[in-house]
Amino acid sequence: MTDAPSHSMMHNTFFVSPEERAFDDVFFGEWLEAPVAFGAFEGETLLGYAEGSPESWNGRFRLSNICIFERSARGKGVGTMLLKALEEAAEASSTRMLVLETQSCNEAAIGFYKWNGFAVIGFDLYAYTNDDPERHEVRIEMGKKLK
């Protein structure tokens, strides 16, 4: 794995200008508190996005989705920058930890999260089906302390 480009270099490359949009409806309003979403663009092309929300009941911030659509953008620091944006949002919401879920079969994601300072904080052997261990698809909870 190579070093990711610096944040400032990536900022100039992929985030030309920050933009905020308001919505008439609240996505997942029943269960998400103050959700945020970030997109990485190159020109008009959406390269990827990340979204998350604070969990006030436990003082954590849950990364609910991260995806890099453009294969050409993978391994170039776009995902790391999106994680950094979520980390900054988590810190601004005074949460103590950034957490996420992945699966044991997703070795690339596990490596990416570890590269970005996350550690395994828990497992659920039967989160998806009663055959998860046999299918090598165990739910893994990963986290990164912020405070």
Question: Where are the model-predicted features located?
Answer:
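Active-site rim helix/loop that mediates acceptor-substrate recognition in acyltransferases
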Residues: 1-37
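Structural preference for beta-strand elements that scaffold enzyme active sites
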Residues: 37, 60, 97-99, 141
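Conserved beta-strand in the GNAT
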Residues: 39, 45-54, 62, 67
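Short strand-connecting beta-turns/loops that link adjacent beta-strands
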Residues: 43-45, 55-58, 105, 147
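Conserved acetyl-CoA binding element of GNAT-fold acetyltransferases
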Residues: 59-71, 101
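Conserved acetyl-CoA-binding loop-helix of GNAT-fold acetyltransferases
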Residues: 68, 75-90, 111-115
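C-terminal "cap" of GNAT-fold acetyltransferases
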Residues: 96, 103-110, 115-119, 126-147
